């Protein structure tokens, strides 16, 4: 094919199109790979998979590559986190936005930085709802069981091409909060890696 230009458009829920980037040059014969993502479908997917893991009493672990996919994977990660801790965002979403919390940055940013910017009562309320979500949801896979760092603490802590081979070698298991391995539902929401 001939050299050409492409653009990236966003279509909102009302059908209004906004050009996000135009003038992307493609060389003759160059191949472009693109995808469309539905936020609603993604969030429904996470909810369904979390519920299934809870019903089957297995861990849940998220596997992405936010270090390389610097736009899409942190956003996907943010939705994984905000669905898991949905009660927190339902009650304190506006207050968390006021202290510039973005779930794409992980749970550690909330716990270690943003909570300090909330008043004491709200900070305690957020912590309480986090604990309620931990109790209501399936157990989360751990990056570091000794330090209490879950799979949702940092978007770049679970790199799919390192984490999934470890899960496969462990017969489909991942580390739990006590440092032992347990059967896990490995969620790979990025289609680039989902064929694993």
Question: Can you describe what each PLM-predicted range is?
Answer:
Residues 1-78, 87-196:
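Extended, well-ordered protein cores
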């Amino acid at each position: 094919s001939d050299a050409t230009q492409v653009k990236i458009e966003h279509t909102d829920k009302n059908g209004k199109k906004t050009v996000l980037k135009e003038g992307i040059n493609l060389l003759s014969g160059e191949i472009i790979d693109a995808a469309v993502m539905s936020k609603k479908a993604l969030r429904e997917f996470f909810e369904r998979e979390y519920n299934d893991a809870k019903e089957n009493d297995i861990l849940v672990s998220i596997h992405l590559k936010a270090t390389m996919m610097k736009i899409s994977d942190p956003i996907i990660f943010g939705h994984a986190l905000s669905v898991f801790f949905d009660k927190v965002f339902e009650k304190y979403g506006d207050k968390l936005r006021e202290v510039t919390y973005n779930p794409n940055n992980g749970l550690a940013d909330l716990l270690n930085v943003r909570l300090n910017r909330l008043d004491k009562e709200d900070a305690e309320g957020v912590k309480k709802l986090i604990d309620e979500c931990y109790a209501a949801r399936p157990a989360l896979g751990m990056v570091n069981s000794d330090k209490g760092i879950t799979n949702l603490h940092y978007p770049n802590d679970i790199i799919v091409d390192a984490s999934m081979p470890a899960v496969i070698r462990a017969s489909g298991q991942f580390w739990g909060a006590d440092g032992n391995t347990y059967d896990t539902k490995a969620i790979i929401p990025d289609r680039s890696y989902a064929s694993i």
